Amino acid sequence: ISYDDFERKMRVGNLQDIWKGAQFIHQSVLISRKYQIEHLYNVENKISADFEFFYHSIMSGAKIYKLDKSIAVFKSGGISDTKRLRAMLSNMKVVMSKDFSIFKFFYHGSKMFNELIKIIIKFFLPKKIISFFQKINLR
């Protein structure tokens, strides 16, 4: 992931934890044309159609191969970065619509609460301090 003044490598997480949120960067996924045509993105889901596609694919047992190689570099600042709370809520709706549980509901709720606190703190801190902590936290 390319940030303004540093880069970060991200490894694929545990696919069984997809209910917690994306376990990989969608730009790094290669999908067979046939599978993609048979399983289109939900264009009504404006914020997390990619997450919805991968969530349903993983939960339905689609064949997935993990490569231990970097195959994509992308710049931060997409919708899931700039509209983080909305993206988190949208992901939660995807999970809850198919697999509701109180535990998962509170898990997502606590993640969104933490994100709200971060947004409030970032509002008051100078950009240099925010950037400093991002470098420490994301490396």
Residue spans for each PLM region:
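Membrane-proximal basic amphipathic "stem/tether" segments
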Residues: S97-R139
